[in-house]
Structure formats: structure tokens, C-alpha cells
Amino acid sequence: MLSIKDVYEKFDEIGCCSFATLDGNGGVDSRIAHFFAYDDEGLYLRTMTGKPFFRQMIEGGRLSVCGERTDAPVVWDDENMPHFQPGYMMRVSGSVRLLTDEELSVKAAANPMFAVATYDINKYPETVVLVMDSAWGELYDYDFNMVHRDHKILRERFSWGGATFVPAGFTITDECIECGACMDACTHKAIVAGTPYRILGERCDECGNCHHACPVGA
């Protein structure tokens, strides 16, 4: 499973990502931001107390972040079909809390990544630091045209701080009659023959082609 360090480094490669919060009125807000540090407790971000972003995190206590990294943008052919270059998407969702001044001082003394937060607080006194301390997420590595491998995706889910996750991918039940229809229908090469047939969750895009093709609904 990916460590918090691994997750941070993937997001850091992306740079700025979409940070979504509950707006307090039944809706969702999002904005572009980034994580600036990590440790064993979680991922760290900073904002200012006058911003809706701050209020929404304090009142709602939840945060969801996603971003994508690819070497080239999607291109469209003459039939308006998209062609994606290999890349990956990262997402993480969980709880977020405000660090006290004492906590921040201790972390800044031990971890040089917090220097930017100290600098910002000195320059903009309303700057605060929050930590995503309990969360789950997924690395979705894609190569839809199979440029570098013989299957389209690799998914890896992770969690920390007591959060849990549902493993990626569908499953095949014992009702399977081993006819192979699901394997023929799967364009992601996620199905392995056996008794019963088995779906590799890390390759499964949950498109539903296998269920659609199965004559017994297994």
C-alpha cells in the first residue's frame, strides 16, 4: 500500500490540484491549491482565515483532493475520439483539522518542509496550517492505448489515520459457469480464468462489460 510519503510525492509531481469542500449550504466548492508537506500524521496545506476555504474546512471537517499528471494533453481525431497519453490520476478524501501554534512550532523545528508555512505566517499573519489526518484515496495509473504495457490501467488504493477503503474492481460470484464471455468482453484484460473466473481489481475499471456479457449474472 502506498505510504503517506508516496502519496505526497505523487501529488507534488502533479503540482496544483483541485481541493473540494462542503460549502455549508448543501453544495460543494472547489479551488486550486497544493499540499506543501507530509509526515506520519498526514498531508499538510495552508490557507488564510478570511477565506471560504478555511471556513468550510473548519465547519465541515472534510476535504477531497484530485489531480492528474500526463506528459501531453488529450488529442481528438477526425471522428472526435479522444486519445490519451499515458499518465496517472490521484485522489484522496478524508478529515482535516487545524494545527495549533504549538503543534506547528514543533513540526517546523523538526521538518524543513514546514519552512514555507513559517515564512507565510510571518508575512501574512492570518495564514494557518491544516492536516489531512485520516483519509483514503487511489492512484489510477492509465495507459489506455497500451503504449508501455499490455493492459490499460493499474489502480492502487490506500488509507491512513484509521480510514478504510473498499478494494477496487468488481468480483465474480460462485454462480460463474466458466464460459469465458466476461473475459472476451473485458477490454482491460482484468479477468483471469479459473473456478470461478476472477477479476484483478487493480486492472478493473468497473465499466460493467463483464456483467453485461455474463449469461447467468455472476
Task: Place the predicted regions along the sequence by residue.
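A mid-sequence, solvent-exposed acidic-amphipathic segment
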Residues: 157-175
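Iron-sulfur cluster-binding cysteine motifs and their immediate structural context
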Residues: 181-198, 209-218
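A short, Trp-centered hydrophobic/proline-enriched beta-strand micro-motif
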Residues: 9-26, 63-67
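Short, active-site-adjacent segments that bind or coordinate small-molecule cofactors and metal centers
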Residues: 118-156
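A short, well-structured catalytic beta-strand-centered motif of the EAL phosphodiesterase domain
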Residues: 33-37
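Short, structured beta-strand-loop surface elements
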Residues: 50-114, 124-127, 136
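Short active-site oxyanion
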Residues: 40-44
